[in-house]
Amino acid sequence: MVSQDFSREKRLLTPRHFKAVFDSPTGKVPGKNLLILARENGLDHPRLGLVIGKKSVKLAVQRNRLKRLMRDSFRLNQQSLAGLDIVIVARKGLGEIENPELHQHFGKLWKRLARSRPTPAATANSAGVDSQDA
């Protein structure tokens, strides 16, 4: 069974890792007030990065709540996302959505992302940015 923790190795930590996902995403899943970008990472576990700016979500309380919900949802669904670097970009209005609706929305988005993954043969030529290079 895959552990459901959110340890340091499951986070995108450096600007270089974020840039790799932004520059060449292999998967894009637009959602209500957010965008999920994903890229193969060549590892056996997924990694998550969050982008929630003050322009999109004004109050720090709301930004922190969103980050907590996003991390928790990722943690519970990471078994279907193995081998991906994922960046979630928040957009205006995301802070006004209630927690149950957000949880439901993220469940659907993770399923869409898992379904939209390219086949392993298609990604054999693209090399991921792994955490040992940092």
Swiss-Prot record:
What Pfam families does the record tag this protein with? Ribonuclease_P
Which keywords fit this entry according to its UniProt record? Answer: Endonuclease, Hydrolase, Nuclease, RNA-binding, tRNA processing
| Cited InterPro entries | Ribosomal_Su5_D2-typ_SF, Ribsml_uS5_D2-typ_fold_subgr, RNase_P, RNase_P_CS
As one GO molecular function, the record gives: 3'-tRNA processing endoribonuclease activity
Record PROSITE patterns: RIBONUCLEASE_P
Q: Which domain of life is it from?
A: Bacteria
Q: What is its EC number?
A: 3.1.26.5
What is the name listed in the Swiss-Prot or TrEMBL entry for this protein?
Ribonuclease P protein component
Primary role: RNaseP catalyzes the removal of the 5'-leader sequence from pre-tRNA to produce the mature 5'-terminus. It can also cleave other RNA substrates such as 4.5S RNA. The protein component plays an auxiliary but essential role in vivo by binding to the 5'-leader sequence and broadening the substrate specificity of the ribozyme.
Q: Which family does it belong to?
A: Belongs to the RnpA family.
Q: By which gene is this protein encoded?
A: rnpA
Biological processes per GO annotation: tRNA 5'-leader removal
Q: Name one GO cellular component term.
A: ribonuclease P complex
Subunit and interaction comment = Consists of a catalytic RNA component (M1 or rnpB) and a protein subunit.
Describe the reaction catalysed, as an equation.
Endonucleolytic cleavage of RNA, removing 5'-extranucleotides from tRNA precursor
NCBIfam families from the entry? Answer: rnpA (TIGR00188)
Q: From which source organism is this entry?
A: Pseudomonas putida (strain GB-1)
